[in-house]
Amino acid sequence: MSNILRKVIENDKGELRKLEKIAKKVESYADYMESLSDKDLQAKTPEFKQRYQNGETLEQLLPEAFAVVREAARRVLGLYPYRVQIMGGIVLHNGDVPEMRTGEGKTLTATMPVYLNALAGEGVHVITVNEYLSTRDATEMGEVYSWLGLSVGINLAAKSPAEKREAYLCDITYSTNSEVGFDYLRDNMVVRQEDMVQRPLNFALVDEVDSVLIDEARTPLIVSGAVSSETNQLYIRADMFVKTLDSVDYIIDVPTKTIGLSDSGIDKAESYFNLSNLYDIENVALTHFVDNALRANYIMLLDIDYVVSEEGEILIVDQFTGRTMEGRRFSDGLHQAIEAKEGVRIQEESKTSASITYQNMFRMYKKLAGMTGTAKTEEEEFREVYNMRIIPIPTNRPIARIDHTDLLYATLNSKFKAVVADVKARYEKGQPVLVGTVAVETSDLISKKLVEAGIPHEVLNAKNHFKEAQIIMNAGQRGAVTIATNMAGRGTDIKLGEGVRELGGLCVIGTERHESRRIDNQLRGRSGRQGDPGESQFYLSLEDELMRRFGTDRIKAFLDRMNNDDEDIVIKSRMLSRQVESAQKRVEGNNYDTRKQVLQYDDVMREQREIIYANRRDVITANRDLGPEIKAMIKRTIDRAVDAHSRTNRKDAIDAIVTFARTSIVPEETIGAKELRGLKDDQIKDKLYQRALEIYDKQLSKLRDQDAILEFQKVLILMIVDNKWTEHIDALDQLRNAVGLRGYAQNNPVVEYQSEGFKMFQDMIGAIEFDVTRTMMKAQIHEQERERATQYATTTAAQNIQSQAIGDDFDSSADFSRVERNDACPCHSGKKFKNCHGRKAF
């Protein structure tokens, strides 16, 4: 083990020597750059661009380009990057992660690689975790880029597609991780190229990279549409039922946070819902509601997993940052179950139209880099998943913070008493204190205890995150006491007020260990920035969540031996301290394994998504006739239909092929069994294909010109692809839930998911081609002289696709072109148009 550790340390030292050598070369240009006038320094940007066009690589330009940015930052911002910041910038340019401590100037470090990579003209995305940081960094650092002649854009959720397109066309674009992901998904749902906003993904530099690529790796970005549902009463009934249960009626598995009914609970459910067998196949939907109601009531905790806003909305709390996750909902009906539990309005369920995880989103960039102060503990995952190395960068000044040994107490009560006493003592001498908590519930509890002790303080958690910047700004002032969840102002420095250094600097107090050592290190890193004095102290108890869920029998035995009199005594035990770290490592390992498994499943979706999106993009950007592609689909559809009946009785086969041809290819009266008898399969295929080509040409002749034809072809393909892809995503989700049980049959669930997912994808492609064929052959196309051909083509395709989706039992001569939403549908169904063939449009 010591040999491995020694090798790792030597590798890090060797890497730092290489970086220092390049950094010195950058520094060698300092005097020359300082001697240049503003105009001459600004002229370096077009010079570099020209040199790049002439064949010089970005690596060859690096020393000069970095030196230009250093000098520009000095003139514009009054800041001059240190050598360690240059080294960090080189690591970023190489597509790796420099681990730089809090307060070491990561934002300024990023300016050098961002400028260098922007010279290529393909766009650089600077990714932050929230819009406040995006706006702040784009405003401050944007001054340097603009001064050097580069354009800077900010991509915010509230911007219109036109404004977003403008932001993405800039040399440098600041955005949040979620907005970049959603823009990518939305771009792959549009019908016209001019509605797309992003360029091809080139270089992303991710701030707080561990938060985005590790903590949120499993978080899927989902674009979904509402599904009409009358199931709200079922959510309420299921909720009313589970609230009648006693603790013996359900079983909770604490480590996995899963729950199920016990035998007595099943008996109660059958009695409550008047059923003979709860788990009969016809009750599958009901058991889904009951399972979600159980989770909502006995697993999901108010103020820990979610909060209720003043507007009565359920907001998810991010377990890593403590922030509420606006716009996000628990999936699979759990969110609706929580809404029923809390008695707020139940919102409709939704159907996923497109989704992607951050893991696969950011792996699509040509080059990916990131910055953080805490990543070394996740080095293996960065390397395995993202092919990124973690390079620890030395601090500019030695760290003066004192990290005290953890103080361990027997109970939560004794721990909190000690925390309050410590805070009070420091407050009375004027030393600022930041108290870090894992949950909103804990921050509220400590706040209440501090009020009782007469200590004025500020609370920063998911309930008042809008005051974050102001609270963090004052957290380093004399006598300030701040309670914060893990959000603790990542990306915002806590600057010490006058006279605070002499008092020992900011003291960070952790009230329990997080599941991840990295999050603990982030909390510690709030103190002792840039060589400032500071302290950190963690208070733990044997009743903490981490110890309760992952502690060993030895800890439980230790607890049993404790007397009530011993409650307030600090426990000094190396064994228990090791158990804490061991529990954290175990959780980190479990989380990594889970993320790896998620990636294995998501890679199936990724491969399929890339095929669909690439073909979709090809259709959208096409300036050519798409006839050859559509004809190929028609040919394959006919071949599949004929081949499907080749092994059946010949008479039955001919009858089935005739039925297919009549419903999907030709007018009914124009083909019969007599015409196909005596022909071989290949001859039947050729005959049907020739008839289809005649109808295809006849259909397109109804459109005015080539532009209208191309628009019709595009919308025809895109609407059907989108419809089928949405259904396929839903089917893959269901498959994923189903294959999990196959592990009990000694089958590998991932392998099963891969093989069945591939077969489902092939089936979906066949279904797309069948619908394109049927719609192309059977659509009622009318020329609209007074309307733009493109608008007409879009409407016609949408209506005909919806017609095919609803069924074939309608009046095929009906004209839908001038029907208002509340008119009777021309298909004579008796329904209003908006509820029949106009349903897709409205």
UniProtKB/Swiss-Prot annotation:
It is a peripheral membrane protein. One of its GO terms (cellular component) is plasma membrane. One of its GO terms (molecular function) is metal ion binding. It holds the Pfam family SecA_DEAD. It is an enzyme of class 7 (translocase). Its EC number is 7.4.2.8. Keywords: ATP-binding, Cell membrane, Cytoplasm, Membrane, Metal-binding, Nucleotide-binding, Protein transport, Translocase, Translocation, Transport, Zinc. SMART domains: SecA_DEAD, SecA_PP_bind. It catalyses: ATP + H2O + cellular proteinSide 1 = ADP + phosphate + cellular proteinSide 2. Its cofactor is Zn(2+). Transmembrane segments: none annotated. The keyword Cell membrane applies. PROSITE patterns: SECA, SECA_MOTOR_DEAD. Coiled coil: none annotated. It is found in: Cell membrane; Cytoplasm. May bind 1 zinc ion per subunit. Zn(2+) binds at residues 825, 827, 836-837. Its main location: membrane. One of its GO terms (biological process) is protein import. ATP binds at residues 85, 103-107, 493. Part of the Sec protein translocase complex. Interacts with the SecYEG preprotein conducting channel. Has a central role in coupling the hydrolysis of ATP to the transfer of proteins into and across the cell membrane, serving as an ATP-driven molecular motor driving the stepwise translocation of polypeptide chains across the membrane. Monomer and homodimer. Part of the essential Sec protein translocation apparatus which comprises SecA, SecYEG and auxiliary proteins SecDF. Other proteins may also be involved. Belongs to the SecA family. This is Protein translocase subunit SecA. It comes from Streptococcus equi subsp. zooepidemicus (strain H70). The gene is secA.
